[in-house]
């Protein structure tokens, strides 16, 4: 039996870098963010059409992107059922993650 190596996060790797990788290391999530940056606040159905990502898959990614903080949503989770929800890219958080990535790679800029 082959033992898979354990994924190890180096001690000097900040948690924000993991969030950066979760977004920019996934084509679907990158496509969602790109769509929202170009199109502005959008509903799930519009994001699905614009990115060609299936609605169930899109829902999973939107949830994760919201948890990471790169999406702003106009309604809190408890008020969303049966309502149209608009998602928008959080440019400030995206910039924070970009800066964390650059800081990790290049040190003090």
Language-model features: where?
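Amphipathic alpha-helical dimerization/coiled-coil segments
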Residues: 1-17, 34-38, 81, 86-109
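Short helix-coil-helix linker/hinge
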Residues: 22-29
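Short capping segments at the starts of secondary-structure elements
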Residues: 27, 39-43
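A short acidic, leucine-rich amphipathic alpha-helix
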Residues: 46-49
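Key DNA-contact positions within bacterial/archaeal DNA-binding proteins
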Residues: 56
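Short, hydrophobic-biased segments on the C-terminal half of alpha helices
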Residues: 62-66
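Beta-hairpin "wing" of winged helix-turn-helix
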Residues: 67-82
